[in-house]
Structure formats: structure tokens, C-alpha cells
Amino acid sequence: MEWLNEPASWQRTDDVLQVNVDPNTDFWRVTGYGYIRDSGHVYGEVLAGDLDVAVRVRGNWSSQYDQAGVMLRADERTWLKTGVEYFEGKPRLSTVLTLGLSSWAVSSLPDDTDEIALRVSRRGDAVEVRYSIGDASPDLAALVYLPPDSELLAGAMCAAPEGPGFSVSFHELRIASRPPAKG
């Protein structure tokens, strides 16, 4: 496992990664805001081909755009991040796909959401994002394209673009390569 933009304070024990998210961190490219940010934190491993990332995320997000979840990243211009993002005073399910420029989709979550389970799966050029809250069955949040031939840094992501930072924990982080499907 390796860090992209290692935070000042973090610890991993047993099956929990605890991060104090540094302020002024984010991943974004141009769309709607005009700026480029590539300073968020990612803890994961580089994999090629088909893969799965699964994790439960608990956070105390409270400032606009506080975020934590999963990232698949080929480079600074090609990536996907998904998870909880605090937006307009509420936790939201957020997915950003960046292929040169960022595209952002958000949807509502219960106002008291402090934990979410995520599963992100890449098969060929398709990435499927699923989420669940509590004991609910996983729901499909997004199906997006990422170039199939790219190696990806796959793992836990967090950022605090506007606030003072926050604390987040990642539980049962699982990152696995999958053999290609036989046709």
C-alpha cells in the first residue's frame, strides 16, 4: 500500500485506517470552478486490469465539500472518486469522473449519514459504483468509462477543500485484482 499526498496525521491498526484530513486538499479539474486541484489523500495500491475496491467509511464531515470514499486514478487527468461529500449542509453521495475535465454527480443521503459502504468494480472499460447504508442491499450509483489499458491507483480517498480538515476512518478496506473474464 502507498500514499498519494500522505496526510500529516494517520494511523493503520488491524482493519481500520484512521486519517486526520489535511485542509486545502481536493481532486478537481476545471469544470464550473476554473481551477485544478490534485492534493487530496489516497491510500491504496497500483493495479492493472479488472479490480474491486470495497470499504466502509465513517466520517464527521461538517464543512462544505468534506469528502471521503474510494478513488481509481490513472493520472492527474484520468480518475474517478466516489463516496460521501458534505454539500449544502448535508452528506451526499458524490461521484466525480475526470477524463481531462471533471464531471460531478450528487444525490441525497439521509441527513444523519455518518457511515457508508462502497464497492467499486472495474471490468474492462466499465467501472460500477455501488453503495449501501446500514444493512441495506447495495444500490447502483454509477456506471462510467475509464480506459481499460490504464494502471490505476485504487484505494481510500479523502479531502477537505474548504474547511479546517476532519477525521475519517476506513474500515475493512479490500483491494483485489480480478482475472479477466474468459470469453
Question: Residue ranges of each PLM-predicted region?
Answer:
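Extracellular glycan-recognition regions
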Residues: 1-183
